[in-house]
């Protein structure tokens, strides 16, 4: 039995992780975020009520769950306050159930200013960041000039460090990007309020999680974004700024890697991507590519980013990219989401290989973005189904064509599909194998 479960995306993000984390946390004591920041967008629908979380772990809607933000997360206190307010107005005791590592790097206004100024300067070569300061905050961390949550509790020393780092960033903003400088006095004043807010929630996360493990408590690690956006293993440079893969769990939480159990990979029954970057099976982007099937996927699947509101690009399921994600993460089993979006399509395609210019075939996707320019997807066509799968709760409720589609994905990837999501509500799910019971 796996007491410690990792839930992560195996595509380009937006796979539906939030719903699955919420579903599985019925059996968990802890839910831990270990990377990313408020650039994540996890949408949960419970009894018809929609909640979108960006920073707070998805387990916050479960009364019995402690939610943890690990050291690998870059924390925007401003974003945290905005997210806490509507939850607390609904009677959810966020401050009593949310715990934060003192080692979390802080996202402050100058990070946001830098992020946005850079995207403007890139013009047509823009990466498509969320403009929320994530990348610049990680840069400061690696350069060892970043301010962390723990720094807020010595305000005199914080003020000195802040002045130094803001001189560095404001020089770039004004002289290179021709943007306005960020006010040191305003940022410092905001920080004083942040210290008061965070004091009661800051803990030694490593010690807390290790004690939980020794007690036999069930712990879930909630990934943000997706494997193919990983800073090291994704389609670089069109990636996020953190390690979105299973390897990021230990580094981003301080939890011993030997104790990780089941790795649940979340994948849509088709593919989507937000922003720029390679997408071999793309059908629709709202601009140059206007395939009607791709438009169906985007419209029926409500494919708009929960964080940015941007239209997602859509395409066929890519087993080649999935094999790369499986290698990196040691995926134990899949959760296939949005199966119901495929309802009504006469035929479906799965990418089984990438053909190179020299005629050779890749079975696992390349890493660098440039390499994707030389590939042509090889498709296998399967019959679709006209029946309605929305809200199905057992395999018996699915048409045979849908079952065949799922089985083919299992065959092509070598990994079982243990969970199938057939709608946005936590109850619209088929659970073949429960990760905590595997």
From Swiss-Prot:
The keyword Kinase does not apply. Substrate binds at residues 306-312. Its cofactor is Mg(2+). Transmembrane segments: none annotated. GTP binds at residues 13-19, 41-43, 312, 338-340, 421-423. GO terms for cellular component: cytoplasm. This is Adenylosuccinate synthetase. Pathway: Purine metabolism; AMP biosynthesis via de novo pathway; AMP from IMP: step 1/2. It is found in: Cytoplasm. Belongs to the adenylosuccinate synthetase family. GO terms for biological process: 'de novo' AMP biosynthetic process; IMP metabolic process. Homodimer. It catalyses: IMP + L-aspartate + GTP = N(6)-(1,2-dicarboxyethyl)-AMP + GDP + phosphate + 2 H(+). InterPro entries: Adenylosuccin_syn_GTP-bd (IPR018220), Adenylosuccin_syn_Lys_AS (IPR033128), Adenylosuccinate_synth_dom1 (IPR042109), Adenylosuccinate_synth_dom2 (IPR042110), Adenylosuccinate_synth_dom3 (IPR042111), Adenylosuccinate_synthetase (IPR001114), P-loop_NTPase (IPR027417). It comes from Vibrio vulnificus (strain CMCP6). Plays an important role in the de novo pathway of purine nucleotide biosynthesis. Catalyzes the first committed step in the biosynthesis of AMP from IMP. Its EC number is 6.3.4.4. Mg(2+) binds at residues 14, 41.
